[in-house]
C-alpha cells in the first residue's frame, strides 16, 4: 500500500504551516502521480501504527494467526535486509521473542536518546542493521517500581553506567532476578566504581580504581584498544575471525576489571588491554591537560588488564550468562559510528556476539558458514614450467598478433 505523511525533520521544518495533504499534492504533481493512489494519514493509522517506523517504507510479514513483524530498509550501502535480518524476522514469528530491558531511573544510558553517550543506535534504531530490534529482539526501557518484581518475560537486563546508587531493595530485586536465571549485561565507567561495585561484587567482579590509559601520538591517552582473547575465540567463531583480522574494540575511557571465581560463576576474559604501553592510571585526574606517566611508586603497573568478562554457571538444564564491560561508551551511539584512522575497530561485533551468547545462539541469527575446503592441487610441479610458458609467452603473443591483425584490417579499409 502507498501512503503519505510528513515525517522527516526536513519536511516538518520546511512545511510547518502546511497540511499533510497539501504537501502530498505538491509532490504528486511534480512526479506526475495520482493522489488517489495514496492513503491519507488517518486511513493508514486506522490500519497500522507506523509512527515507530518514522513512516518510512517498511515490509510486514504476517502469519494466518495474525502474528506479524517488520522487515526494514537500512541506512547503509546495502540498504535491503540480508539473510541474517530476514531469518531473524521469520524466527520472531514462530518462537518466543527474547526481551531486552534497559534499566532506567539512576542516570543510566538511555536507549531512547540519540545523544552521543546513549544507546539508541544499538538498541532500537530501525535504520541501523545491527540494532537489536532488527535482529529478533524486543527492547524496552525498564524502571524498577516499589512492590513489583522484575517481570518474568525479561530475558536480558542491561545496566549501564549507573550514576546514582541502587537501593537495597533494588539490589535485592536484581538478586532475585539472577536467582531465577536471568541474564545480565553490565557496563561500568571510570569514576562510577563506588556506585557500581555493590552490584558486581556479588558475582565476584570488581571495577578497579583509576582509569586505564594507552598513550599514543594521535589519540587521547584513555582510548583503549581492546584485544580479543583466546577465551573469546572459543566462545565465538566470529570473534576468531576478527582476531585473525587484527580487529579491536575501542573503549574511550575504561576501568580495569578484577575478578574471582568463588561466587559460583566461571569467569572468562573476553577483551584485554595490550600487553605493553597500557596501565591503570591512579594519579592523573585531567588526562587531556596533564602529562600521563607511569609511576610504579604510586602502584601503577604496565600489563594486561581485563576490560570485558563473560560469566556463566549451570542452572538446571540451561546456562546463566552475564557480560561485564569496563566501559559503557564502547557501545554508545557515537562510538558505533566513529572512524579513527589507523584503528580497525569492530565495536558493533561486540554487541552482536554478546547478545548472541546471552541468548545461547538464538538471536542475532548466525549466518556464518564453514570455509570451503580447498586442499588439493591436481597440477604437478613438473608441469608448472609449461603453464608459465603458456601465460607468459604464448598467450601474450596471441593477443599481440590479434591486435596487429585487427589494426592491419582497419588500416586497409
Regions found by a protein language model. Give the residues of each.
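Hydrophobic targeting/anchoring helices
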Residues: 1-127, 131, 364-367, 376-393, ...
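Generic alpha-helix detector with strongest preference for long hydrophobic helices that associate
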Residues: 42, 71, 113, 147, ...
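A mature extracytoplasmic/lumenal domain signature
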Residues: 63-65, 73-77, 104-106, 163, ...
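Acidic, S/T/G-rich, low-cysteine, solvent-exposed domains in lumenal/extracellular/periplasmic regions
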Residues: 120-363
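Conserved beta-strand termini and adjacent loop/short-helix elements that scaffold enzyme active sites
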Residues: 1-4, 103, 142-144, 210, ...
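A glycine-rich phosphate-binding loop feature that marks nucleotide/adenosyl-phosphate handling sites
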Residues: 216, 370-373
Amino acid at each position: 500500500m502507498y501512503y503519505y505523511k510528513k515525517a522527516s525533520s526536513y519536511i516538518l521544518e520546511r512545511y510547518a504551516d502546511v497540511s499533510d495533504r497539501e504537501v502530498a499534492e505538491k509532490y504528486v504533481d511534480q512526479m506526475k502521480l495520482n493522489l488517489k493512489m495514496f492513503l491519507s494519514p488517518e486511513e493508514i493509522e486506522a490500519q497500522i501504527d507506523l509512527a515507530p517506523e518514522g513512516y518510512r517504507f517498511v515490509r510486514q510479514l504476517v502469519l494466518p494467526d495474525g502474528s506479524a513483524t517488520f522487515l526494514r530498509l537500512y541506512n547503509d550501502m546495502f540498504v535491503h535486509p540480508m539473510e541474517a535480518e530476514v531469518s531473524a524476522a521469520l524466527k520472531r514469528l514462530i518462537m518466543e521473542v527474547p526481551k531486552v530491558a534497559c534499566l532506567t531511573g539512576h542516570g543510566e544510558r538511555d536507549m531512547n536518546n540519540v545523544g552521543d553517550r546513549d544507546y539508541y543506535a544499538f538498541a532500537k534504531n530501525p535504520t541501523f542493521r545491527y540494532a537489536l530490534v532488527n535482529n529478533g529482539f524486543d527492547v524496552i526501557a525498564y524502571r524498577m517500581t516499589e512492590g513489583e518484581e522484575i517481570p518474568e518475560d525479561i530475558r536480558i537486563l542491561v545496566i549501564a553506567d549507573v550514576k546514582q546508587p541502587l537501593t537495597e531493595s533494588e539490589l535485592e530485586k536484581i538478586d532475585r532476578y539472577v536467582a531465577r536465571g536471568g541474564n545480565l549485561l553490565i557496563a561500568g565507567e571510570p569514576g562510577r566504581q563506588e556506585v557500581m561495585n555493590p552490584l558486581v561484587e556479588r558475582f565476584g567482579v570488581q571495577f578497579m580504581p583509576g582509569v586505564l590509559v594507552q598513550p599514543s601520538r594521535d589519540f587521547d591517552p584513555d582510548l583503549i584498544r581492546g584485544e580479543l582473547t583466546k577465551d573469546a575465540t572459543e566462545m565465538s567463531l566470529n570473534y576468531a575471525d576478527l582476531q585473525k583480522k587484527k580487529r579491536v574494540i575501542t573503549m574511550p575511557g575504561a576501568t580495569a576489571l578484577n575478578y574471582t571465581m568463588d561466587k559460583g560463576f566461571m569467569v572468562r576474559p573476553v577483551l584485554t588491554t595490550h600487553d605493553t604501553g597500557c596501565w591503570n592510571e591512579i594519579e592523573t585526574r585531567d588526562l587531556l591537560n596533564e602529562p600521563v606517566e607511569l609511576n610504579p611508586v604510586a602502584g601503577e603497573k604496565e600489563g594486561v588488564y581485563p576490560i570485558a568478562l563473560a560469566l556463566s554457571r549451570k542452572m538446571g538444564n540451561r546456562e546463566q550468562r552475564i557480560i561485564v564491560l569496563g566501559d559503557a561508551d564502547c557501545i554508545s551511539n557515537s562510538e558505533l559510528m566513529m572512524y579513527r584512522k589507523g584503528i580497525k575497530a569492530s565495536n558493533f561485533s561486540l554487541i552482536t556476539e554478546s547478545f548472541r551468547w546471552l541468548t545461547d545462539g538464538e538471536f542475532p541469527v548466525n549466518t556464518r558458514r564453514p570455509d570451503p575446503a580447498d586442499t588439493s592441487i591436481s597440477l604437478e610441479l613438473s608441469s608448472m614450467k609449461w603453464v608459465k610458458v603458456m601465460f607468459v609467452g604464448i598467450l601474450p603473443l596471441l593477443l599481440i598478433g590479434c591486435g596487429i591483425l585487427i589494426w592491419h584490417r582497419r588500416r586497409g579499409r
